[in-house]
């Protein structure tokens, strides 16, 4: 009964979502990526097209004035002409961003979340540490291996001096 209701709800949501996606497609204008596009990149300093594509009347007049001598242009007009062609200067492109703070913050968040998860697992999931990890047990096991003379040529027992009952130096 519950599974049937869940599947019907999921089915209705899937159908309504796909209808919304199909209805939404007619509103959005798709971009033609075969045409040249404007990009601000340091390694590609001259983009294929200008930043401003549709010029206003004052911008068209400024473009006509550009064809004459550049010494007659003011500094502001030269800057405006530059801004018609480029969105950012090299200084603006090279300016550091604060994106590193977001990256470091996200990394610290995930490291902290992982640490909390490990603490929770150690407390609630894992059982007690086996008795074979205790120092007393390890000492007994080492003594047993030495008594059995395990790997006497190059291994464990080769490093033990049986006459002095100590490790060789």
From Swiss-Prot:
CDD domains: Cyt_c_Oxidase_IV
Name of the featured protein: Cytochrome c oxidase subunit 4 isoform 1, mitochondrial
Primary subcellular site in the record, as a coarse category: mitochondrion
PANTHER family linked: CYTOCHROME C OXIDASE SUBUNIT 4 ISOFORM 1, MITOCHONDRIAL, CYTOCHROME C OXIDASE SUBUNIT IV
Highest taxon, organism lineage: Eukaryota
Extent of the transit peptide: 1-22
PTM-bearing positions, type N6-succinyllysine: 29, 60
Record gene name: COX4I1
Pfam families, A to Z: COX4
Residue stretches spanning the membrane: 99-124
Species in which this protein is naturally found: Bos taurus
InterPro entries to which the protein is assigned, alphabetical: Cyt_c_oxidase_su4, Cyt_c_oxidase_su4_fam, Cyt_c_oxidase_su4_sf
Similarity section: Belongs to the cytochrome c oxidase IV family.
Residue spans, topological domain Mitochondrial intermembrane: 125-169
Subunit structure: Component of the cytochrome c oxidase (complex IV, CIV), a multisubunit enzyme composed of 14 subunits. The complex is composed of a catalytic core of 3 subunits MT-CO1, MT-CO2 and MT-CO3, encoded in the mitochondrial DNA, and 11 supernumerary subunits COX4I1 (or COX4I2), COX5A, COX5B, COX6A2 (or COX6A1), COX6B1 (or COX6B2), COX6C, COX7A1 (or COX7A2), COX7B, COX7C, COX8B and NDUFA4, which are encoded in the nuclear genome.
Membrane association type: Single-pass membrane protein
Biological process according to GO: mitochondrial electron transport, cytochrome c to oxygen
Keywords tagged on the record: Acetylation, Membrane, Mitochondrion, Mitochondrion inner membrane, Phosphoprotein, Transit peptide, Transmembrane, Transmembrane helix
Function per UniProt: Component of the cytochrome c oxidase, the last enzyme in the mitochondrial electron transport chain which drives oxidative phosphorylation. The respiratory chain contains 3 multisubunit complexes succinate dehydrogenase (complex II, CII), ubiquinol-cytochrome c oxidoreductase (cytochrome b-c1 complex, complex III, CIII) and cytochrome c oxidase (complex IV, CIV), that cooperate to transfer electrons derived from NADH and succinate to molecular oxygen, creating an electrochemical gradient over the inner membrane that drives transmembrane transport and the ATP synthase.
Mitochondrial matrix topological domain: 23-98
Residues the record lists as Phosphoserine modifications: 56, 58
